[in-house]
Amino acid sequence: DEEAIKALPERVIAQHGKVDLVFNNAGITIDSDFANMPEPDWDKVMDVNLHGVINMTRAFLPYLKDRPEAAVVNTSSIFGMIAVPRQSVYHATKFAVRGFTESLVKEMKGTSVQVHCVHPGHIGTNILTAAKVNRAEGESAPSGLLGRADATHEEQGKAFRENGMHASRAAQVILDGVRKRRSRIFIGMDAKLIDLAQRLTPMHYDKLLPLIFLPLMLFRNKKAIQDLPAEP
């Protein structure tokens, strides 16, 4: 809703008096090959993942530039660096968010506004559970790192959520990156290794993905920050 977005900065300022940080984090996906994806599904993901980021940034940027120090934080993904099958629309949005944000980093140099592009690795969220699945007639679910080919959508979503870094830890990494003025913020060792792999072997990184994901999945800290015992 572009009109609602245009009105949002004034509502925020009326309630809080100022705005210093804008986090563009909303994201959805669809599990579908490109040839069988209905156009409305494609457009919906583009609207949420890309146009939402652009419209929110456009709406808030004039107010942020009036602050002595401010930041825009846009969430891309490791899927803004690499590509896998059945995620063409998600990749299209996340590569675009990356390009948009990195251009904005350069445009905002010399102003009071920092701009950050976030590349999360495997974070334990409900994005896979909430994803629409579109399969051609007779097509089975592809086997993946997180489950069997015959696993249900719910089982795959549960495995994805339970084996990822807890979202509270991801949030802490983002805040630390903003404080340290990092234009690129990688969340998790998997994100850092994937970035390295696609730089070293841009056409064959997919063969390295199991070696990256599986060991990290076993040792990743999945506890929420608030669940950790207090230090003595």
Question: What does each model-found stretch correspond to?
Answer:
Residues D1-A7, E39:
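The beta1-alpha1 cofactor-binding region of Rossmann-like NAD(H)/NADP(H)-dependent oxidoreductases
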Residues R11-V22, I30:
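A glycine-rich helix->loop->beta "capping" turn
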Residues D33-F34, P38-D43:
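Substrate-binding pocket helix/loop in short-chain dehydrogenase/reductase
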Residues A35, I82-V89:
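Active-site loop immediately N-terminal to the catalytic Tyr-X3-Lys motif
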Residues T57, T93:
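Active-site helix of classical SDR
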Residues S77:
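Residue(s) in the substrate-gating loop at a strand-loop-helix junction
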Residues G110-M189:
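SDR active-site lid
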